[in-house]
Every structure is written in C-alpha cells, then in structure tokens.
C-alpha cells in the first residue's frame, strides 16, 4: 500500500468507497477532480482488486457521475491510454455506444460513407463485442463489407484522408480500456467506462456527434466536454438515438446542439429543438428498421442503399443520418440542406464509389 500511495496519491478505491462514494445513491458524496483522476489512474494501472473495483463501479452507477468526474476520467484516459492519430481532414467524430445494437440495423456506416461522399469527413470507432451487451457495432458491419478494421491509428488517419471515412479500432488506439474487458464483462451492468470510451476521440476531431435517451444526458455530455482539459471538441450535435446508438430515432425526436451563440449563453448551454423525421422523408416507425442478423443485414442494406438499389425506409434513414453528420460539421446550413447533399451523393454514384474506395484501402 505504501508504494501505491507514493505512486498514486492518498485515495485508493477502498478509501473512496468508505469515505466518499460508497454510502448509497442518496447519501454518497461526489468526488473532486483530483480524487476521480486518481481513481481512474489506479484502475488503468490494474491496482485495485476485482472486488473493490466492482464495488467502486457500482457505487458510481448508483450515485451517478458528475460532469467533473467524467471529465477527469476522460482526461486520464486521454493521457494514459489513447493513442491519437490526427488526419489532415477534420472529421465528425461519431461516438456510438461500443456495446452495440441487438434489434435494429446499424445505419452509421452507410450514413458516414454518404456524408463523406458529399464532402463531410466522418470517423467512427468501436471495439469487438464490448461488454456489457457484447453486440454488433461499427466494426462488425465494416467486417461484413470487407473493410479493414484491425488497423493501427496511423492507418485509420490515412483512411480518413484518402477516403473521407475512417475507422479506429479500440484495442489499437485505446489499449488501457481494452485491457479492462474481462472485468467489465464480469460486472454484468454498464459502468462509467461505457460512457467515457465514446469520448475517446482518436482522430482529435473538433466536432462530436452522439445520441441520448433523455435530454439531461446530452447536457451532461456537453458539460463533460467543456470541463475536460484534454478535449479538442468545439461543437457537438446530439439526438435521440435507437438503442443508444448514433442512428436517429424515427418520429418526433429531439436534437441538441452546442455551443449556443448569444449574449445570454454560457459555455455549457445547449440549444434543443424537435424534428419530425417524416418531414425529412424518414416516415417510418422504429419497428421498420428491425433486422435479425444485425451485422450481415446492416452491411447488405448499406451496400444496396449506396448503390441506389433501395428507395425504402432504410434508404430514407441512411440519408437523414448522413444529413445530420453534414449539418453537425456545418457543411450545410440546415438539416434539410444536408439531406439534399446526401441524396445527391447517392443519386450521382459518388456514395457507391466511396464505399469501393473504402474497401480498396
């Protein structure tokens, strides 16, 4: 313990449990930035025993992390685990949940490629069967499309610059988080790691795109980005997504963007507004996007939509999700203008050509 104290400080996880976070969701205290930083440094350093780590993760889950705590975790992850590789292009960083989807098609590959074909570079990142759900994610759709995924960060950056769309593989760019796989798997529930890994931003992008179930989560993510000392994000767009993924939910859905300009606004304010996806051509229900074989069918849908061979609800959903990426980077003044760019990229064949380039990389 003496060596741990010299190396890390005076807040081992067991002490944080007994004195700060471990008394229950109503009476627990929040950690200071210093305490949260030390906790995550110890976790990434494999210092806590499994029982103490599990208890700490559960205590954080029960009390709910503050933006300051999450920002501290993001900063430690950036300093001690993430290997960034910055492309010349400044892509939209898509932070989808790493543990994947289990009911509906993954549309972000198709949407990202369409956006890239329209001139908006896009970066996505994921692992391989990440706990807790261990379901299909970006990697698995790309694998089905015969796109290289198990590549080094420098190659991922080159992919963005050469193709306009790039994929970063978690074991390659974020090995410290990847090393926690077994412990996370044994937990059986999500932890704060599921949140902070989506903010890893391996391409050092200035624009982040994410999703939420409740608007309060989007506000917390913005405050986390603002309070992070390592984040390069200058603009963020969030929307209500399907299964926690960055595929917009059909119907009436909330979109939130940051920053907000104006004299009355502070650094952490967000602007939120409702859209009806049917007004953008996506006039379907969530059930219409369900598939049985998530990776395989998502890949087949992606290929057909980009080739102009489908004009159904999936095609409309891919186009609108591409539009949101284009709008996020401010390559269009409105979502509608982004949608027009996306549809043109599909119609003129450039989206299919971009997919060919991605496969050839």
Predicted regions and their residues:
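Short, structured segments at the rim of ligand-binding sites
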Residues: 9-12, 19, 67-70, 131-151, ...
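Contiguous N-terminal and early-domain "leader" segments and peripheral loops that mark the onset or edge
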Residues: 56, 143-162, 166-173, 322
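Predominant activation on well-ordered alpha-helical scaffold segments within soluble catalytic domains
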Residues: 18, 22, 37-41, 54-58, ...
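Acidic, glycine/proline-rich low-complexity segments that act as flexible tails and inter-domain linkers
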Residues: 1-102, 116-118, 122, 129, ...
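Glycine-rich anion-binding loops and their surrounding alpha/beta cores
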Residues: 2-15, 31, 86, 162, ...
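A generic, well-ordered mixed alpha/beta core segment in the N-terminal half of proteins
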Residues: 90-159
């Amino acid at each position: 313990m003496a060596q741990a104290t010299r190396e890390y400080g005076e807040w081992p996880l067991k002490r944080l449990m007994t004195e700060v976070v471990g008394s229950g969701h109503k009476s627990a205290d929040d950690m200071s930035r210093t305490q949260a930083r030390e906790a995550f440094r110890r976790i990434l350093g494999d210092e806590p025993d499994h029982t103490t780590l599990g208890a700490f993760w559960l205590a954080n889950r029960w009390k709910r992390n503050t933006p300051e705590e999450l920002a501290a975790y993001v900063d430690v992850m950036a300093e001690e685990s993430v290997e960034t590789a910055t492309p010349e292009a400044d892509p939209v960083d898509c932070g989808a949940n790493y543990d994947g989807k289990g009911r509906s098609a993954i549309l972000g590959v198709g949407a990202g490629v369409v956006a890239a074909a329209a001139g908006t570079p896009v970066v996505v990142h994921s692992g391989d069967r990440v706990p807790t759900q261990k379901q299909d994610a970006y990697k698995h759709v790309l694998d089905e499309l015969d796109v290289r995924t198990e590549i080094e960060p420098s190659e991922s950056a080159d992919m963005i610059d050469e193709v306009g769309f790039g994929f970063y593989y978690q074991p390659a760019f974020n090995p410290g988080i990847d090393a926690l796989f077994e412990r996370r798997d044994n937990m059986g529930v999500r932890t704060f790691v599921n949140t902070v890994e989506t903010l890893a931003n391996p391409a050092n992008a200035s624009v982040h795109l994410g999703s939420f179930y409740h608007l309060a989560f989007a506000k917390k993510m913005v405050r986390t980005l603002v309070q992070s000392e390592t984040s390069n994000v200058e603009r963020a767009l969030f929307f209500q997504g399907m299964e926690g993924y960055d595929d917009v939910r059909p119907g009436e859905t909330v979109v939130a963007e940051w920053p907000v300009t104006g004299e009355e606004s502070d650094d952490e304010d967000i602007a939120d507004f409702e859209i009806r996806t049917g007004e953008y051509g996506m006039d379907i229900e969530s059930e219409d996007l369900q598939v049985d074989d998530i990776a395989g069918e998502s890949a087949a849908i992606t290929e057909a939509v980009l080739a102009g061979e489908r004009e159904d609800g999936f095609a409309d959903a891919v186009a609108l999700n591409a539009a949101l990426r284009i709008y996020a980077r401010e390559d269009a003044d409105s979502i509608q203008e982004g949608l027009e760019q996306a549809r043109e990229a599909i119609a003129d064949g450039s989206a299919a050509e971009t997919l060919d380039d991605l496969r050839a990389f």
